[in-house]
UniProtKB/Swiss-Prot annotation:
GO biological process, one term: L-valine biosynthetic process
Alphabetized GO MF terms: ketol-acid reductoisomerase activity; magnesium ion binding; NADP binding
Gene field: ilvC
Lineage: Bacteria, Bacillati, Chloroflexota, Dehalococcoidia, Dehalococcoidales
Protein name: Ketol-acid reductoisomerase (NADP(+))
PROSITE patterns: KARI_C, KARI_N
Cofactor binding note of this UniProt entry: Binds 2 magnesium ions per subunit.
Length: 332
């Protein structure tokens, strides 16, 4: 049974006198920093000097400095730079600022779990991972609600790492929605699997396969786009709101019967076997090794695949159709 913490389990006073340093002011960084500040906590931000994050954090009223300076000053250091940058940032600028009594925090376990960052034994190492994008973490906080988070403790040098992490979670508003206890290993492996097999890799491959099947059978690409991509949001929103059963109760009986009888033919035993292989590559570290080496080599495979995918017909058709949808506003 999952252990979930709520407001009664979180004591904000534990970190009220501590200085919190946020590394990065991007998608998650801005939300963490602003929520913590609005909770009455002391926050400083570390970014690349003169960069977009530096300018934005300064405009938002934060004291901004280089990472090395922040690491010396802060009692709690939350690593919110991109995963692929964190190991270098840590080695170059954070490690030398760590002292007994400090806590190093993460919002994703990749670098700790796969040994890219190895903190000294005298610091607490914890994770608070909000289960939503940064803009939503900020939005629900300003509305008086909160987003759920995962909590994990990798090192408890102080003897109160969990309590301190729970206080941080309250600072960003997760006490209002629930803070589920996990481990760095479980968070990392399930997060990667979800991205690869379902949320990103699985979904985009399914959408493209459906689109290509219809187009190759002679149907208009525009109609195929609507049926296989555009309407996906309607179904996902229903599942998000009330689960799979709620979604099925909200669609026609014809759609439901097709779901029950044809869905398992698309996602079949072969798919389960492949999913197991993908999970195995995550668990044994082979995916992490592949991705780390890809970055070290300058991302040749990544860049080639990204370019190829951007040229898919579904992108051309989608751009044309979306340009006529006045309610869609492209984010700047």
């Amino acid at each position: 049974m999952a252990v979930i913490y709520y407001d009664k389990d979180c004591d904000l006073s534990l970190i009220e006198k501590k200085l919190i340093g946020i590394v990065g002011y991007g998608a998650q960084g801005h939300a963490h920093a602003q929520n913590l500040r609005d909770s009455g906590l002391k926050v400083i931000v570390a970014c690349v000097e003169g960069g977009r994050g530096w300018k934005k954090a300064t405009a938002d009223g934060f004291e901004v400095m280089c990472v090395a300076e922040m690491a010396k000053k802060a009692d709690i250091i939350m690593m919110l730079a991109p995963d692929t940058s964190q190991a270098k940032i840590y080695k170059d600028s954070v490690e030398q600022g760590l002292k007994p009594g400090k806590m190093l925090m993460f919002a994703h376990g990749f670098n700790i779990h796969y040994g890219q960052i190895v903190p000294p034994s005298f610091v607490d190492v914890t994770m608070i991972a909000p289960k939503c994008p940064g803009y939503m973490l900020r939005q629900v906080f300003t509305e008086g609600a909160g987003a759920p988070s995962l909590i994990a403790v990798e090192q408890d040098a102080s003897g109160k790492a969990k309590e301190l992490a729970l206080a941080y979670a309250k600072g960003i508003g997760s006490n209002r929605a629930g803070i589920l206890e996990t481990t760095f290993a479980e968070e990392t492996e399930t997060d990667l699997f979800g991205e690869q097999a379902v949320l990103c890799g699985g979904t985009t491959s399914l959408v493209k396969a459906g689109f290509e099947t219809l187009v190759e059978a002679g149907y208009q690409p525009e109609v195929a786009y609507f049926e296989c991509l555009h309407e996906l949001k309607l179904i996902v929103d229903l599942m998000y709101q009330g689960g799979i059963a709620y979604m099925r109760d909200s669609i026609s009986d014809t759609a439901k019967y097709g779901d029950f009888t044809r869905g398992p033919r698309v996602i079949n035993e072969d798919t389960y076997e492949t999913m197991g292989e993908i999970l195995g590559e995550i668990q044994d570290g082979s995916f992490a090794k592949e991705w780390i080496l890809e970055n070290q080599a300058g991302r040749p495979v990544y860049n080639s695949l990204r370019r190829m995918e951007s040229e898919h017909l579904i992108e051309e058709v989608g751009a044309e159709l979306r340009s006529m949808m006045s309610w869609l506003k492209k984010k700047k």
